């Protein structure tokens, strides 16, 4: 991370009293109650008589912050970080066209056809999923690759669960490599002021070692099932890839990477590349636009408003002071262990994106904010492997598998996820402190 992080722009402290709130609640109490209720709904999602997903819970919280008078509409609009939204949108447009062209299915099949033993298939799934996720967002990779993997495994009649866990965990770990790997990395990349290349260089040993550890752990835990050779050859129907469209998509992504490596604006390059892709694709834009995760953009925008309302209560200042007091005077090792422990815990309580947002103003005030941002990116990502509900990628794999009659149990996942998470976070801290 090449230049010092900066605190976000915006108001601090409670809003002035000249407003007429729709709900007669004290701003302090209302802000705290709305924030807590929103994060409970995000974490739990299912309560008696309440069925809300994360974007819906975030939207309700954002609207409640304005309705209760915690924020004015103008303050709510100003709270939304358009750099993050624009960056996500531009990347999603390019990825959407690659999906339309069946690039991800083709890439998955190209790898799977070359393996002949269970152990090599596991390595291909973990490493291949990780590398794809480092570039094209782990959620998308899991969404597209899971059905391809299940079809391949059904042909050789082996239990698919170990490989599904390998895909989910490998995708999570590999996504730590770059700012395009997952949503929380995008937040860290923009807020920390890191360049694309700087982030990549510092996270390379973290992600590479993490993938090796993940494979080794899975190889050991499922050593009986991963021994020998497949009873039959992996056979899959050929994917009808749209070569011109895929070439254009990969070319535009390559142009974007060159722009990022040159130090140009992350969101500016992303949205320009996405817009150019719409222009040159020569396909109905609706196909790609339909694949944009609008619900994720809504979730981010809503969380920005909720967090600004929480900030207006003064609670963020209290958290900042407590965190600084806890870590102040610590060595780089102490800071890294402290931040990784907090982020791993928060990421499994309230999800990794809200956890990173919660620490947006805290990290720049820590003794070594550059190291702290890297640890936040690493630990919030690796913590997604702890439990089945730890990341959206995990849930996508589980839901896709369940649609084909394969259920991944909570404890079945946890017995693998817990050791993988502990080992990879320990490695991540060591790598960032020693090589950073």
Where are these regions (language model features)?
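Re-entrant/interfacial helical elements at transmembrane boundaries that shape
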Residues: 107-108, 140-151, 164-165, 178-192, ...
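Hydrophobic transmembrane alpha-helices of multi-pass small-molecule transporters
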Residues: 21-96, 205-209, 215-318, 416-436
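Membrane-embedded alpha-helical segments and adjacent helix-loop junctions characteristic
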Residues: 74-160, 294-369
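Helix-loop-helix module between adjacent transmembrane segments
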Residues: 95-96, 116, 128-138, 169-178, ...
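Compositionally biased, low-complexity flexible segments
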Residues: 1-20
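Helix-loop interface residues and adjacent transmembrane-helix termini in multi-pass membrane transporters
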Residues: 44, 51, 70, 100, ...
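Alpha-helical transmembrane segments of multi-pass membrane proteins, especially transporters
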Residues: 54, 58, 92, 122-126, ...
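Membrane-core helix-loop-helix motifs of multi-pass transport proteins
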Residues: 155-224, 231-236, 368, 373, ...
């Amino acid at each position: 991370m090449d230049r010092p992080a900066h605190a976000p722009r915006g108001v601090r402290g409670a809003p002035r009293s000249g407003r007429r709130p729709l709900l007669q609640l004290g701003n302090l109490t209302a802000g705290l109650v709305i924030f807590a209720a929103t994060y409970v709904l995000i974490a739990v999602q299912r309560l008696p008589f309440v069925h809300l997903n994360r974007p819906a819970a975030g939207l309700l919280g954002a609207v409640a912050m304005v309705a209760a008078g915690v924020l004015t509409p103008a303050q709510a609009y100003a709270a939304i970080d358009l750099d993050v939204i624009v960056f996500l949108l531009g990347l999603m447009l390019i990825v959407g066209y690659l999906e339309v062209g069946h690039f991800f299915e083709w890439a998955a099949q190209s790898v799977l056809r070359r393996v002949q033993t269970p152990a090599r298939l596991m390595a291909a799934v973990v490493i291949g999923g990780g590398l794809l996720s480092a570039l094209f967002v782990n959620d998308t990779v899991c969404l597209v690759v899971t059905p391809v993997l299940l079809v391949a495994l059904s042909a050789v009649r082996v239990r698919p669960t170990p490989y599904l866990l390998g895909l989910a965990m490998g995708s999570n770990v590999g996504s730590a490599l770059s700012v395009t790997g997952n949503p929380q990395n995008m937040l860290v990349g923009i807020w920390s002021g890191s360049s694309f290349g700087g982030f990549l260089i510092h996270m390379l040993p973290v992600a590479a070692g993490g993938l090796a550890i993940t494979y080794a752990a899975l190889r050991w835990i499922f050593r009986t099932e991963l021994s020998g050779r497949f009873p039959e050859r992996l056979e899959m129907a050929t994917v009808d890839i749209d070569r011109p469209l895929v070439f254009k998509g990969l070319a535009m992504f390559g142009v974007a990477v060159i722009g990022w490596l040159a130090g140009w604006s992350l969101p500016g390059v992303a949205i320009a590349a996405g817009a150019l892709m719409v222009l040159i694709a020569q396909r109905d834009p609706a196909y790609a636009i339909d694949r944009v995760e609008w619900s994720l953009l809504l979730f981010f925008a809503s969380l920005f408003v909720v967090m600004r309302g929480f900030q207006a209560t003064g609670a963020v200042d209290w958290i900042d002071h407590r965190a600084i007091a806890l870590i102040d005077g610590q060595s780089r090792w102490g800071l890294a262990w402290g931040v990784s422990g907090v982020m791993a815990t928060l990421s499994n309580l309230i999800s990794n994106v809200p956890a990173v947002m919660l620490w947006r103003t805290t990290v720049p005030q820590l003794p070594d904010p550059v190291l702290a941002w890297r640890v936040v990116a690493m630990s919030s990502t690796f913590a997604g492997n702890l439990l089945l509900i730890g990341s959206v990628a995990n849930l996508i794999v589980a839901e896709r598998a369940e649609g084909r009659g394969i259920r991944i149990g909570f404890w079945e996942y946890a017995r693998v996820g817990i050791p993988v998470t502990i080992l990879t976070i320990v490695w991540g801290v060591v790598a960032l402190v020693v090589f950073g």
